[in-house]
UniProtKB/Swiss-Prot annotation:
This is Paired box protein 2 homolog. Keywords: Chromosome, Developmental protein, DNA-binding, Nucleus, Paired box, Transcription, Transcription regulation. Residues 226-246 have a biased composition (Polar residues). Residues 226-258 are annotated as: Disordered. The keyword Nucleus applies. The keyword Magnesium does not apply. It is found in: Nucleus; Chromosome. GO terms for cellular component: chromatin; nucleus. Residues 91-217 bind DNA. Transcription factor. Involved in negatively modulating apoptosis in germline and somatic cells, acting in partial redundancy with transcription factor egl-38/PAX5, probably by directly regulating transcription of apoptosis regulator ced-9. May bind to the DNA sequence motif 5'-GTAACG-3' in regulatory elements. Residues 169-217 are annotated as: RED subdomain. InterPro entries: Homeodomain-like_sf, PAIRED_DNA-bd_dom, Paired_dom, PAX_fam, WH-like_DNA-bd_sf. Disulfide bonds: none annotated.
Amino acid sequence: MFTKTFSNNYMTSSQSAYCNLQQYHDSRVCLLKCCRVQKVDPYFPRIALNSATSYPTVSGTVSLPKAETVEPDLWIKSFKGNEDPLLSDGSHTGVNQLGGVFVNGRPLPDTIRAQIVEMSQHGTRPCDISRQLKVSHGCVSKILGRYYSTGSVRPGVIGGSKPKVATPRVVECIAGYKRANPTMFAWEIRQKLIEDQICGEENVPSVSSINRIVRNKSFMAQLATPTSVTPSVARPSSATSQNQRSPPRGVQQHMQQSTSVQQLQQFQLTSAATVNSLISRPAFAIPGTTHSINGLLGTFPHSSLLDDKFTNLSTHSADMSLVYPTGLVGEHDWAMRTPMVILPQNYCGQL
């Protein structure tokens, strides 16, 4: 009797303990299911947790939330608002760890960028900005760094060529600054362009670009300076060049022929004058300075010999400078062997 009563009591206590354990397990499962954060994916339906539904368990009934399917577009609009510029183009969207929606390959809208800068100016830390706006910390830091360096919140250009910053107006302003102050540095010119509101932080030329513009301007100025030659001689006026028309082709040939004939006649006259100067015989030659017998004896060669040689020279006057040196007459004559010296008039014939 005692054993049966003890066994009944033991079974009752064991059943109650098992039921309590099962109830505790069911409650923990319900708590985990209610607190679990679902993975966000805008391309699949979401489950909305609405009114509770009772589910039977071993220990009794447990209330669980009711599952309701929501369309993806409605869920996305309810997540970030009905008018989200990130979702307007229909690109591939994603959700970061903070729950913010982003589009791959697209920068943040200007409104969010301006809001980031405004919150930073009010003293909000970047980490707090990241949590409040649901934007990654790296994106916030990059936007603020770009704003502090360039003064602009607009995103950079992805691909393509940069816009031209050295416009004609900017080039002329740089040249004017350099003419006004030749010792001005390139970084001072860059700062001056920003102060005069000729350029902004986005389109101001770099220091290397300004140096290149200054070098090109100085080179062009050197080319523009006139040379030492008289301008009227070096560069005749256009009116003069137009008035001086070239003669016809036949007239040009005739003029060239006449010019060549005149040059030939002048050369012949010069040769004849050279021969006549050689015909004039010297008054006396210094003894011992010549190597011919005529020079040693103080006599002159026969006149017929001189006439023959001068006749040959006159007929071949054009080639005389190539055969004999200047001032010489013939190969076997005393005048060709040695140089001649003209003595003064008061010379009496003795050395």
